[in-house]
Amino acid sequence: REQRRMAGAEALKAIRARTGTAQSAAPAKKVDGKLYKDVKTNCKKVVALACSTGGPKSLQQVIPMLPRNLDAGVVLVQHMPAGFTASLAQRLDEMSDVQVKEAEDGDIIRRGHVYIAPGGKHLRIVKNGSGHKIQLSDEPAIEGLRPCANIMYESLERCDYDEITCVVLTGMGADGTKGIKGLSDRHKKIYVIAQDEDTSVVYGMPKAIAQTGLVNEVVPLNRVAEVITKNVGVS
């Protein structure tokens, strides 16, 4: 037991040290939306993002850099306990041109809006007439995770988006990989962006999806917002 405790302490120390070095990359810049005006117009698009360890700080280099008129809604799963995601959403909203909120059951997914899965809830995206909405549930945790990114991605199998931009940022483990692979297996049109190893606090989740061969672009943290915008455009 003592050996496990010491090993855990060493792992935590390594993550803390890595947090400092990973975030020392050049800061991200706000994306100039005018550069991406005529990108994939007249189609339904969504951005589905997953992150874990190191995610809250990394999201500050992504969400506030997105243009206000991003031509897609953004739904994201950040592994956090209940009670913490509301303050994360508020902080990001204050920093951003896009509107950011903690997701509520029944929220209609709108362009230029970001919805963060509440800690302690699973989040699904479901069809709602000609659009889509958010559905939350208290189902049991999956491999210790609630919210779980795989649940979010798997729900998109039953949606009618023309393209799904999947983004995987820093995090321990492999959450998101199974769900994204499922989208590919069902011939959904996906575009996959993964954070690179150098800027990841923990290169677990991005590595797992990269190893599937499904990733379209591997980019440093300071380019994630630009690549998202380049792929979905602005309205």
Kindly give the residue locations of the regions a language model identified.
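Strand-loop microenvironment adjacent to phosphate/nucleotide-handling motifs in alpha/beta enzyme folds
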Residues: R1-S235
